[in-house]
Amino acid sequence: MTSNNPAVFLLMVNGQIESADFPEYDDLYCKYCFVYGHDWAPTSGLEEGISQITSKGRLSQSLVWNFPLDITFKSTNPFGWPQIVVSVYGPDTFGNDVVRGYGAVHIPFTPGKHTKTIPMFVPESTSRLQKFTSWLMGRRPEFTDPKVVAQGEGREVTRVRSQGFVTLQFNIVTKDMKKLGYDTTSTEHSPAGLTRASQQL
């Protein structure tokens, strides 16, 4: 293939997991991973990571990580557009590390700088006895694979509770999407911005 007829397009993502708001908790850290479709492949960067532990300041209720993100994907089509899954952990009353929140968001479609705030949630026990037992044993309900957060299967039967927010900042660059017929320019009429150029007259 020549450079005039590319077979793939590139999505370059960098930015940071900036901060979190969990009013009831302190001394938290986060893990992240990317979830993407079968036609997508990472070409450089890290697919997953774990941050440092952060504490609230005297005058601030925010937990600041400023944890860097940097990854590049290649794909032949936008189906299965990458999502980032963030899991937040911290100590409970007994000093055990327990999950404080899960959340996911799609990587922005349009090039440029974007800020996203993810509402976080935690799975809950289905009965009071299970709640008491899990609190006593220090084993709260959690997903065995956090990537399930970005997928729909089985989510409708999971009992969850909203808890906190995480803010991420993205810098997005795309390459060769226009050459493959995809327009990612932001317009007022299509906020997602991901439409076939051939459909626009």
UniProtKB/Swiss-Prot annotation:
Sequence similarity: Belongs to the B9D family.
Domain of life: Eukaryota
Protein name: B9 domain-containing protein 1
Keywords, ordered alphabetically: Cell projection, Cilium biogenesis/degradation, Cytoplasm, Cytoskeleton
Record-linked InterPro entries: C2_B9-type_dom
Subunit record text: Part of the tectonic-like complex (also named B9 complex).
GO process annotations (BP): cilium assembly; smoothened signaling pathway
Function: Component of the tectonic-like complex, a complex localized at the transition zone of primary cilia and acting as a barrier that prevents diffusion of transmembrane proteins between the cilia and plasma membranes. Required for ciliogenesis and sonic hedgehog/SHH signaling.
Gene: b9d1
Compartment(s) where it occurs, according to its Swiss-Prot or TrEMBL record: Cytoplasm, Cytoskeleton, Cilium basal body
Cysteines paired by S-S bonds: none
Residue ranges of the TM segments: none
GO function terms (MF aspect): hedgehog receptor activity
Any single Gene Ontology cellular-component annotation: ciliary basal body
Annotated C2 B9-type domain residues: 9-126
